[in-house]
Swiss-Prot record:
Protein name: Small ribosomal subunit protein mS41
Alphabetical list of SMART domains matching this protein: IGR (SM01238)
Keyword list, A-Z: Mitochondrion, Ribonucleoprotein, Ribosomal protein, Transit peptide
GO BP terms: mitochondrial translation
Function: Component of the mitochondrial ribosome (mitoribosome), a dedicated translation machinery responsible for the synthesis of mitochondrial genome-encoded proteins, including at least some of the essential transmembrane subunits of the mitochondrial respiratory chain. The mitoribosomes are attached to the mitochondrial inner membrane and translation products are cotranslationally integrated into the membrane. mS41 is involved in telomere length regulation.
Targeting presequence: 1-22
Gene Ontology CC entries for this record: mitochondrial small ribosomal subunit; mitochondrion
Subunit description: Component of the mitochondrial small ribosomal subunit (mt-SSU). Mature yeast 74S mitochondrial ribosomes consist of a small (37S) and a large (54S) subunit. The 37S small subunit contains a 15S ribosomal RNA (15S mt-rRNA) and at least 32 different proteins. The 54S large subunit contains a 21S rRNA (21S mt-rRNA) and at least 45 different proteins.
Organism: Schizosaccharomyces pombe (strain 972 / ATCC 24843)
A Pfam family of this chain: SAM_Ribosomal_mS41
Subcellular location: Mitochondrion
Family to which the UniProt record says this protein belongs: Belongs to the mitochondrion-specific ribosomal protein mS41 family.
Amino acid sequence: MLILKRIFIIRNFIFPFSNCRYASTVPSPRSGISNTNDFFKRIGRDTAEKVNGKFESWDGLFRKSTKTMKKEGIDVRTRKYIASQRNRFKEGFIVKPYPVMVKKNGGERRKRK
């Protein structure tokens, strides 16, 4: 019983914000990216047109969850792409567009033998 109490105390009082999304910091704009439109133009794949007006502020871009993006009508591929580029920007990597990969010969299930 004592062990369970210790685990409860450690989990709830020492690490209260470990699973909190809002505990993370919002990075400052850098390297020619001063607002959300510049960010979306830099990452490519026409994200600036797809999310037009859905991200008003810089904080909103980094605080908005993918569930909120889904409620606003952003499709799955775009949500995943924005989330991955957003995390790369937080980690300090250079933001650049990833090419859309094309399957060869219809994918691995239809692979030529």
